[in-house]
From Swiss-Prot:
Pathway: Amino-acid biosynthesis; L-histidine biosynthesis; L-histidine from 5-phospho-alpha-D-ribose 1-diphosphate: step 1/9. This is ATP phosphoribosyltransferase. Its main location: cytoplasm. It is found in: Cytoplasm. It is an enzyme of class 2 (transferase). It comes from Xylella fastidiosa (strain Temecula1 / ATCC 700964).
Length: 304
């Protein structure tokens, strides 16, 4: 690695998150649940790590990929849409993409969609030829149009994309959609999904080799312990041996059953991790199949 591309030597890890927006609070909750705490500076943009040498930078979400690329931050929590847009832009300009997605975080889900005025009779993508498409994601859209061999004009806007067709500056839009309420309010309807997005943990492709390496490995393990347990519960019950096969068939989203030491009651003590919703109906089905003393326990964190 040349000196110009080498990562700066530091003994503290830096994470960038959105200063204010829909990903801010979920990102802070995740990091706090991983055991991190901070002392906030006067300007409220830099938070000094207290529990661990892991500092937090509060910035605009579209600055996060660049801060990682420049080595200013080691990690960033950002929407996949923003990360992919800047990566696509760099590739289209012949620049390397020095960062990567390390983990999907399963919050901030949305979709990048093509949406047309409600009065359109939509049939297929051939209708896009020659049309003007307003978007804040020109590089992703350009790649998609190129892949589908569609010649259309991209109208780049930094915001308020939904109003472009009503203003006459575009025929349709390509924008993020969560519930679809904003589209409906502007008499638009989604027709094609370009990509799915969620919050991701991004980092350099070239990982640090100094004191930050151990911190990074530890933090990734903790994040895995939080994210992988999302919507998971520990299920415990008693059952006779002859009922275990039937009970296992009722738990397709569970880990293999673990039998605990016999306490002399004549029934087996069993536990498993379920990775889906355990409703009252499921518990009643398990009870009818032979499970006794059913308990559902919330699991906050785990090291696998």
């Amino acid at each position: 690695m040349s000196a110009s591309t080498a990562l700066p030597v530091r003994d503290r890890l830096r994470i960038a998150i959105q200063k204010s927006g829909r990903l801010t609070e979920p990102a802070r909750r995740l990091l706090t649940a991983c055991g991190l705490s901070w002392r906030q500076s006067r300007d409220k943009l830099f938070c000094y790590g207290e529990s661990l040498p892991v500092d937090l930078l509060l910035v605009r979400d579209d600055d996060i990929p660049g801060l990682i690329a420049q080595g200013v931050c080691d990690l960033g929590i950002v929407g996949r849409n923003e990360l992919d847009e800047q990566a696509a832009s760099r590739r289209r300009n012949g620049l390397p993409v020095p960062y990567q997605t390390l983990r999907g975080l399963h919050f901030g889900q949305c979709r990048l969609m093509l949406a047309v005025p409600e009065e359109w009779e939509w049939q297929d993508i051939s209708q896009l030829t020659g049309k003007r498409i307003a978007t804040s994601y020109p590089a992703i859209l350009a790649d998609w149009l190129q892949t589908h061999h569609i010649a259309a004009q991209i109208v780049e806007l930094s915001g308020s994309v939904e109003i472009a067709p009503r203003l006459g500056t575009a025929d349709l839009i390509c924008d993020l959609v969560s519930s679809g309420a904003t589209l409906a309010a502007h008499q638009l309807k989604p027709v094609i999904q370009i990509m799915e997005s969620q919050a991701v943990l991004a980092g350099m492709i070239c990982q640090p080799a100094d004191a930050r390496a151990g911190l990074l490995a530890m933090l990734l393990r903790r994040i895995d312990g939080m994210v992988n347990l999302r919507d998971s519960n520990l299920l415990m019950f008693r059952a006779f041996q002859e009922h275990l096969d039937a009970l296992t068939r009722l738990l397709p989203d569970a880990d293999p059953l673990v039998q605990l030491p016999d306490d002399g009651s004549g029934t087996l003590r069993v536990q498993t991790m379920c990775h889906g919703t355990i409703t009252w109906q499921r518990l009643e089905e398990l009870e009818r199949a032979g499970a006794q003393g059913l308990m559902v326990l919330t699991v906050e964190r785990s090291l696998a």
